[in-house]
Amino acid sequence: MTNSAKKPSYFTEAGLPYGREGIRISVLVNETLLDAKSEYGHIQVFDTAFFGKMLVIDGIIQTTVYDEFVYHEMMVILASLRIEKPQSILIIGGGDGGAIKQALRVKSLKRIVMAEIDMTVIDVSREFLPEISDGAFDDPRVELIVQNGAEYVRRHKAEFDLVVLDSTDPVPRSPAEYLFTEEFYHEVKDALEPGGVVALHGGSITFQPAEVTTLVQRLRRVFKYVDLYPAIVPAYQLSLFGFINASDQPQAKTAEVERWMQNIEGQNKYLSSEVYETLGVLPPYIQKELGL
């Protein structure tokens, strides 16, 4: 008698840029919804047993419907709470639509610009992961530009209160690699209004500590204040993930944040004022490992 049960299928994530060796994350896949290539990368969408639908680009998990809100609140809402009533935001990347969804919740924002290099990512996300954008791409307040984000930044000076770098990872020789350089951070600073904020993902604190440290050090040579905030986004290697804010003005105090939270439409799922108060706290062993 033969066992005809279907063998479970797992997606195993590729090695992380500048990440530690010896570990990979595998996710049980119910169904492969898309496996295609665009001009800029290999795009896959899986329906998974734990995370639900999951977007993968070049073998690296980008987002899932299960926990995208943690990442996008930490990228967009956190930065918006550093300035009282920001008026304008530029999102570079963010083709899944989660960042613009969060930006639309910031009541004071009058200008929301998104520069995404790969229209295919937007089309795929709209078709297979509409829960993440939740209609944000169709909102008339959003100015969508299909262009290399670095080129867009160079042409705009002192225009934005917030710049969110929601690109793919800094894979060598990829379009995103330049977006993690000190040269580009200077260009971003030029695109910001005085006292503006840039927000970016710094990689896994657990598995990419060298990348996190390098990015913080680069930003410190450009901005007066650079703050690293850890949060657990389960899809990102089940580890502490680093979010970075950089600005020439310090982070807001908790009392200010509690007041400025009124500028956010609806209720945050992750970023409460209580969570904010402890965000910058890193365990001693991590501080030592990062050398920051």
Annotated model-derived regions:
Residues T2-L16, T63-V197, T206-V216, R220, ...:
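The AdoMet/dcAdoMet-binding core of the Class I SAM-like
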Residues T2-Q44, Q217, L238-L292:
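SAM/dcSAM-binding transferase cores
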